[in-house]
Amino acid sequence: SLVGSEMCIRDSHPAIGYIGDDTGENISERNANFCELTGLYWAAHNIDSDYIGIVHYRRYFASRKKSRFAPKKDRVISHEELCSILATTNVVLPRERHYFIETNYTQYIHAHHKRDLTATRAIIARKCPEYLPAYDMYMSKTHGHHFNMFVMKKELLQHYCTWLFDILFDLERELDMTGYTVNDRRVFGFVSERLLDAWLITNNISFEELDIVYMEHQNWLHKGTAFLKRKFFPKKDD
């Protein structure tokens, strides 16, 4: 689906022929804060399929059969190959992202706001404390499954979404975003990336991993410099 469709219509952007996330039960109008999660919410509530997945316009799952040096569009996994993988697993994820010199916790607070995670942890402790050990373990690690990319059996995805949005909607009500930039206000998308592994670990869910195809040019030098700058010269937070 086309995420943020309600805002596209409001801002008079031309239609491009995709199903919007503003049909049926939806939270499309909250896309500025929830990012691709408005599409995930829409899919969980409006699609009747055995498996449901989410990728991005600039990130796709890669075929295991194609060379890393093949043209990017040719490296995107085919329907047939993905189905063959799903015949042996209920969940497909991107390979873990490794920070090496940062934990998942320190990477987040150096890039965003510490209060986001403080509030999130308090909500988990209050609403579903059985997830707290896995959440804390994930935050202490230097790697994890990020990007909000996955394919899941529908029943699992609905379970995940019920749990995820229950936390995020409480966070939306409780979080003070005074002084947040436009990027900071995408907080619920950022936080959700840090919740997936806690859900997987607590529910003992197995999965398969795939590489990612980046459709846009990746300036790794710029990304690495920004990463180090955030670590050694973090912005002040409350």
Regions found by a protein language model. Give the residues of each.
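Short, small-residue-biased leader/transition segments that mark boundaries at the very start
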Residues: 2-9
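Active-site-proximal specificity loops/subdomain of glycosyltransferases
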Residues: 10-46
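Short aromatic/hydrophobic "clamp" motif used to bind/position activated sugar donors
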Residues: 52-54
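Short acidic donor-binding/metal-coordinating loop in glycosyltransferase active sites
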Residues: 56-59
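Catalytic core and acceptor-binding pocket of nucleotide-sugar-dependent glycosyltransferases
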Residues: 120-219
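A solvent-exposed, charged loop/short amphipathic helix patch at secondary-structure junctions
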Residues: 13-24, 66-72, 165-182
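Conserved donor-nucleotide/metal-binding helix-loop-beta segment in metal-dependent transferases, i.e.
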Residues: 62-116
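Membrane-proximal basic amphipathic "stem/tether" segments
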Residues: 216-238
